[in-house]
A protein has these predicted regions:
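Amphipathic, Lys/Arg-enriched alpha-helical "gate/interface" segment within cytosolic domains
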Residues: 1-122
């Protein structure tokens, strides 16, 4: 399952993945990200919460890449990830190398509290 929200007042895109994510769910999430970012100006931040993710279909990878491309095209300032278990990275670090430019700051935290503290400190 994927959820995508945009808090315009905080200029924060929140992406959450939970349980088992299918390729179709990832595809819908990519479409939703593009819709929400349509009129967003550069410099917004992204919080990607993977605390409740159990697994992701390998076919979802291309849609995750589409999400990353949309974020990069709209020139996000930063991407903050919450991944409690580094072994459940699901290839995000590798995909990031190809889909985010060096101008996007990427940080990963094990807890949501640490991630939020990092975001609010910026």
């Amino acid at each position: 399952m994927y959820a995508v929200e945009l808090d315009r007042s905080k200029r924060l895109l929140v992406i959450s993945a939970a349980q088992r994510v299918t390729a179709e769910q990832a595809k819908l999430a990519a479409q939703r990200v593009r819709e929400l970012l349509h009129d967003v100006v550069p410099g917004f931040r992204v919080l990607a919460d993977y605390r409740w993710l159990d697994s992701m279909d390998p076919a979802a990878a291309r849609h995750i890449a589409e999400i990353m491309d949309a974020i990069a095209e709209k020139r996000a300032a930063s991407v903050t990830r919450v991944i409690p278990d580094p072994h459940k990275d699901i290839g995000l670090n590798i995909l990031s190398q190809f889909h985010y430019g060096p101008e996007i700051e990427i940080t990963t935290f094990e807890t949501l509290a640490d991630a939020l503290q990092s975001i609010t400190a910026k």
